[in-house]
Amino acid sequence: VQLSFLNRKVDPVQYAKSFEIAPQGDDFDDIRAEYTAILQKQLASGNNGIVKTKYLTFTIEADSLKTARARLTRIGLDLLGYFKTMGCVAHVMDGQERLEVLHGIFHPDGEPFRFDWDWLAPSGLSTKDFVAPSSLCFGTAKTFGLSGKYGAVSFLQILAPELSDEMLADFLKTESGILVNLHVQAIDQTEAIKTIKRKITDLDAMKIQEQKKAVRSGYDMDILPSDLATYGEDAKKLLNKLQTRNERLFMLTFLVLNVADTKQKLGNDVFQAAGVAQKYNCSLVRLDYQQEQGLVSSLPLGINQIKIQRSLTTSNVAVFVPFVTQELFQSG
């Protein structure tokens, strides 16, 4: 499962037009014109045309396309039911909507997306030609070029023992081009319990070695390295959660993509995002020589090429469930 949270710019001209209230030829046209001017003034000093959207991408493995379609349809209906229970409005995207999302990521200035399925056969083009950027450059270690702009992908190093549900919201409060992606892979419950038991056995073996060393050196065998004692307690607590509290174990990859007009603006945006991570005792680290893989993993395609993962339980992953507040907007 991939969760994507996108802050992107829209075409300012088209966005401004959506605030216009058409005259009706009656005595209230002056009021409509005044109200339109007020809305456009607020737009100029507001969110700078930033639209915030959330996407959930799920992938499966199947023996055939027919089987995959049936399973994907069933899972999609189940997810819509879950969203409805949460009070969240959602719908399954069609092919053109998915292409428009990819186009928006590759064209961060909000250029309008022009596409029709009937254009493919006569033109000899593929869908990739309609969404691809004018240029991509991965010549440096920690940044990349995207159609004359600069981008950088970072991963979140989760160091905090407890996660706050406000961290994701703070990342998305920034009024800049940012794309936050969470790749979540569930681990089989039996395999997860076996893995943790093996870790506990390894820690117990290390504990025995430390005690033998203490006896040979002539000091108290109950004095153990603090890290060893802490890791042992944490592993036993985790095992208890999986066995008694119906928790599952997940592998999480947390990626942050920033895009800006200049290198200096990009540096400021990344620094701001790193400040949010530091606020919650985490660290945002720029990917070294993996910017291309990071960009691919940041697209809502359910593909994760960054194998930097952190194991989390169900309750910890649930912290990143998107909030259900919705921005109300009605054009005209």
Where are these regions (language model features)?
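Extended, folded cores of ATP/NTP-driven motor/assembly subunits in large transport
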Residues: 1-328
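Glycine-rich phosphate-binding P-loop
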Residues: 332
